[in-house]
């Protein structure tokens, strides 16, 4: 069996736009008629630029090759242009192509892919959600200062809606999303606001529901530590990307200074970057995205690294339907 053709799609995602403003898909077609689908999670360039890069990579490394040869595909693409280093744009494209190959393999074997990667482990998994507006776009008008991202009462009310739906954790940016976003030290007033925002949600949902801090790397190490100390009494389950992900040692400083578990990974790719996170004790919860990390087999390898370090996985699910299924 070989892959004889492919097709790419950029699909707009109408409001409320859960998972992104658009999705980028690839379809691989084999000479036996089996079709596999994959999805790129990449916002580094415009959608159609990413689509052109996807086409180029598929033409050079996928067409004419056996979809079962996952390791060969991975090594050829990862080493393209004599680079052989983590590159989030290239590895996102590789993720989509690898995912589509696994789709073909599963169909050819008449087996769900999870059975080919070790089989089912859990009967049930916990599920969390970000606190989104109850209606309208997840990207509200910037002039609106009364939505769930900044109004603690509205956020608390929405959190209760999610609890009623069966979610056991809710995620939000305690810094009043994007209001503390200068890459540095939060002011005393900003710390007060963050604490009040978090406390209001904790009071609403009680102690049985976990709170997840979905920050976006907007603090310096010292600023993140100050915020963590303020919020530790409210018993959050994790503090996500307290500092930018490009300095693992800085993240490790934060991890060593707070009792809140640190989570990271949505902007990382390949086992090499995740291995560094684990070796430096920078995070104990890994948030890999299947459309960016390097594909299913690469995710399986990262899961093995996490197992060795007694870390946990919480896959990043801001994505389209194919990455979500993967």
What are these regions (language model features)?
Residues 1-43:
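Structured beta-strand/loop patches that form or line metal/cofactor-binding pockets in enzymes
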Residues 1-13, 77, 81, 107, ...:
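N-terminal amphipathic alpha-helix/helix-capping segment at the start of soluble metabolic enzymes
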Residues 3, 33, 58, 97, ...:
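Conserved, mostly hydrophobic/aromatic
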Residues 29-109:
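Metal- or metallocofactor-binding catalytic centers and their adjacent structured scaffolds
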Residues 39, 94, 190, 213-220, ...:
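Glycine- and other small-residue-rich loops at beta-strand/loop junctions that grip anionic moieties
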Residues 48, 56, 72, 229, ...:
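Shared catalytic-loop signature of beta/alpha-barrel
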Residues 124, 129-252, 257:
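Metal-dependent enolase-superfamily TIM-barrel catalytic cores that perform enediolate-based chemistry
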């Amino acid at each position: 069996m070989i892959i004889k053709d492919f097709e790419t799609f950029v699909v707009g995602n109408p409001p409320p736009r859960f998972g992104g403003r658009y999705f980028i898909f690839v379809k691989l077609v084999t000479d036996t008629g089996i079709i596999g689908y994959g999805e790129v999670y990449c916002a580094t360039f415009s959608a159609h630029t990413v689509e052109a890069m996807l086409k180029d990579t598929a033409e050079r490394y996928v067409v004419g090759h056996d979809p079962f040869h996952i390791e060969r595909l991975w090594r050829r693409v990862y080493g393209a242009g004599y680079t052989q280093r983590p590159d989030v744009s290239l590895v996102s494209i590789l993720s989509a192509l690898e995912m589509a190959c696994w789709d073909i393999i599963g169909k050819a074997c008449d087996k769900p892919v999870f059975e080919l990667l070790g089989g089912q482990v859990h009967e049930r998994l916990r599920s969390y959600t970000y606190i989104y507006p109850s209606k309208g776009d997840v990207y509200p008008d910037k002039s609106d200062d009364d939505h769930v991202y900044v109004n603690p009462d509205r956020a608390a009310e929405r959190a209760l809606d999610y609890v009623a739906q069966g979610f056991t954790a809710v995620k939000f940016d305690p810094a009043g999303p994007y209001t503390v976003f200068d890459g540095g030290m939060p002011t005393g007033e900003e710390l007060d606001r963050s604490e009040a925002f978090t406390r209001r949600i904790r009071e609403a949902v009680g102690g049985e529901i976990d709170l997840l801090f979905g920050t976006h790397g907007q603090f310096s190490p010292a600023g993140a530590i100050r915020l963590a100390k303020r919020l530790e009494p409210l018993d959050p389950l994790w503090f996500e990307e307290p500092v930018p992900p490009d300095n693992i040692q800085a993240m490790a400083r934060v991890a060593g200074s707070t009792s809140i578990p640190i989570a990271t990974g949505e902007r990382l790719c390949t086992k090499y970057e995740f291995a560094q996170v684990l070796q430096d004790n920078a995070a104990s919860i890994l948030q890999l995205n299947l459309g960016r990390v390097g594909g299913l087999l690469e995710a399986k390898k990262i899961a093995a690294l996490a197992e060795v370090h007694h870390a946990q996985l919480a896959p990043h699910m801001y994505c389209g339907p194919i990455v979500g299924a993967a």
